[in-house]
Every structure is written in structure tokens, then in C-alpha cells.
Amino acid sequence: MKNTVPALVCLLLAACGGGGGGGSSTPATGTTSPTSPTSPTSPTTPTTPVGTSYKVAGLVVGLEASGLVVANNTTDTVTVAKGATSFVFGTQVASGGAYSVTFPSQPGGFQSCSITGATSGTVSADVSLPVICTDAVVSVSTLAGSDTAGYADGTGSAARFGGDPTLAVSGTRLAGLTLDTAGNVYVADSLNSRIRKITTAGIVTTFAGSGVFGSTNGTAATATFSTPAAMVFDAAGNMFVTDTQAHNVRKIATDGTVTTFAGSGIYSSVDGTGIQASFRAPSGIVIDTAGNLYVGDAEAHVIRKITAAGVVTTFAGTTNVAGSADGTGTAASFNDPAGLAIDAAGNLFVADAKNNKIRKITPAGVVTTYAGSGAAGKDDSTTATAATFNVPVNLSIDSDGFLYVADTNSARIRKISPSGKVTTVAGGGIGTDTANAGKDASFVGPTSVVFDKSKTLYVADGNKVRKLVRN
């Protein structure tokens, strides 16, 4: 028998890949050779996936009015609601694409919004722009009238208001303003005993009153007034006028007929219906959505309410008692309440002239102090009741709840924001009449303000009606 063991061992060693230096250098079938490790690759900047796009947005501070519209690249627009703190454009911008943000429409409330920093650029990530809303600079011009008192219809500075220029006047020559639905301005030309009408083009005509001092009813051309102070239209287009020295409230119907709506003409403060009631120098007047009139019965120191049927009651204040107490109804007190404004919720705002305050009355008759510390002054403040006024006599409110105040003795137009911030819109307080921007403008002594739907504020000042618009 042949010796087969060495051959078998050799075969097994070969099958296991073993063997010394004398073994085969070729691996057996089914085995792999070890490989050297690969070197790490150098890091690279990540590439943007094809089709990536980014948001363009804004963070908003201080927006208290409606009407702000922002646009990206002209066509992508967003209307930003008042009180909003952010917005996002609907169309994203592709990576590397351009954005350019503009403001096609600024908000109401004489606010102005702008971007802090760059307004345009290219995108490589989401963009968030800081939008800051502050008080706008306004321009002041004259719509109608001149420095010379008189009486003349005409256009712009050719018109005359204010009566006899030789007459020594301790009070105002022009009083209240109101607007009709077409945007025409009406002014109580007190010392001419007339109601005047001014179109938006500045054309002045006489709306009612013969110019004779009195309280005779009749047609618009023949009726007489005694220092008319303020006016308001009802939904049907009838005008109601507080006829201060006649101590009554007059009505001018749409056909021009003038009648006495409420008040006996006796200097008193008695509730009643129609001419059975009486007033003491009625001043401001507004109307609510139900057709009720509210009157600042200045020298009786109360606010009166007149229903559409002519029923007169005392709504707030203590009759014939001057004071500044807050409270409900007749528990409250005023001191020469003059101009009034009313908001969409039916809250009344009162220019409490001799208290140097703005008061608020809820529909339930609850009276509080809305603005003013009571001290005479011209100080603005972020806290309404810390601000000071100097004989505020008239108010107007816009759709966003901003109040505008004719602060007569400070010769300024003031603004109270819904958050209670009091600022000066226009007027340097130097008691002259110049047409400039904002606080560089000056007034003789503004006596009335009214804000229209196009965001224009009209002011009765001296023998002129002035116009304030955003720069």
C-alpha cells in the first residue's frame, strides 16, 4: 500500500489556503485578497437642490390702522390687518432670484410704515424684513379762506369767512365742520350767522342763512341763525345744527327748509320734547346709527340726547354743575363740554374744554377720562391720561378709532391712538398761520376737525379751512 497521508495533508493545506513559502501564490477559488483602505474625500459645499425657493416675509411693529398694502416685485401683494405682527408673501422666490418690497398703500391714522434696512436683494434663504410703523409727516395747506375776515363766496383764497373784520372777537370766527357723503365740507361760519359749503376743489357757497343774527325759520336763503356751532347729517341727508346763542337745535331738510327741531330758545336746561325742551349754549353734535342726536350742552355742563322724535333727555353730567367726576349718567360731571365724536360701537368722546380732558361715555352712560391729566399744556405721552391739553374744543374719529383733537389754546392738532398714545400731528404752537409740514406748520387756534374717507383731515382755523394730508 502506498503512503497517502503526506499527500492528503498537502491537499488539505492547499484547500485551506495554508502552506509555507513553498505553497502556491495563487489563491484558491472562492477567496478574496485584502484591499488597502481608501483615502477620505475632501468636504464640499452642499449644493442647492434644483427647484428650491424661499419665503419673503415681514415682522411688523406698531401698526394700529388698516389699509397697509405691501408688494414684492410689484405684483405679489399682501393687505396687512391692523394689529398684525407679521405677514408672508404668497409667492416664494427661487434661490438666487430677486426680491424688492414696496408699499403701494400706507395705513390710515396718519401712520407711515417703512422697512429698516435693505428693501431688496437676492435670496439664498428665507427673508424676514423688519417693518416699523410710526407717525407720518403731514402737509398743511389752505382749502379756502384767507387771513382777512369777511363774507364772500368764491374759490379758495378768494372766499371770505368770519364776518366783520373790524369786529373785536374774543372767541372763534369759524366753528364746527362736517362732511356729506360726497366729501363736501360744511363749516359753521359763526360770526356770519351762516352755514357754508366747500367742495373738494375749494369752491365756497352759502348753504343756509341770510346773514342776519336771529332764529327765524324759513327757506335756506331767508332763515336766520345765531352763532351756529356744529352740524351733522342724518342718513336721509337732513342737517342738524346747534345754534349756540339761539339755544336750540335747528334742522335743515334736504329741500333747504329750516325749522327748529328742539329747544325753546330760553337759556335753560330742561328736558322735554321738541321746543318744550331748553338748552344753554349747545355746542357739539353727533348722531348714532339709530338716529339719536347727542349734544354738548356747554354752559349747562351736560350731554343731552335727542331721539328721532325730538325727545330731549340728559344723558350724562350734572345739570348746571361744573366738575370733572367720572361716574354713570348724571353722577358724572363736565366743565363746558364742547365737541363730540362717536365710534362704531356707539361710544361718545367729549372734548371737555375747561377740564383740558377728553372724556368717554359708553352707550350705557358710563363716563371715564380717556385722555388728559387735567393740567393745561401741550405734552404728548404714551399714556393718554398723562398727556396735557389746552382747551380742546372739538374731535373727530376715523374708522380705525384714532381720535383727532382741535387743541385750541395750544394751537395744535393732536392725535390719540387706540392704544392711548397722544401725539402732535401738526402745529408749532406759535399762534400764527403758516403752511408747512407737520410740527413746522402753525395755526391761529384750531376750533374744529373732521376726517374724511380719503384720509384727509380738515381743520377750521381763524378765517380759513385748512387741509392736512400725508406727505
Report residues per predicted region.
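Blade-level signature of beta-propeller repeat domains, shared across WD40, Kelch, NHL, RCC1
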Residues: 445-471
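Surface-exposed interfaces of beta-sheet-rich extracellular modules
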Residues: 59, 86-120
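A short loop-to-beta-strand structural motif that recurs across blades of beta-propeller domains
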Residues: 193-197, 203, 247-251, 257, ...
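Short loop/turn segments immediately following the C-termini of beta-strands
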Residues: 190, 244, 298, 353, ...
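Gly/Pro-rich loop segments of beta-rich domains
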Residues: 137-174, 203-227, 257-283, 311-336, ...
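Residue-level detector of Asp-centered blade-edge/turn motifs that repeat once per structural unit
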Residues: 179-182, 233-236, 287-290, 342-345, ...
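Bacterial Sec-dependent N-terminal signal peptides
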Residues: 2-58, 134-135
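Conserved beta-propeller blade signature
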Residues: 184-186, 238-240, 292-294, 347-349, ...
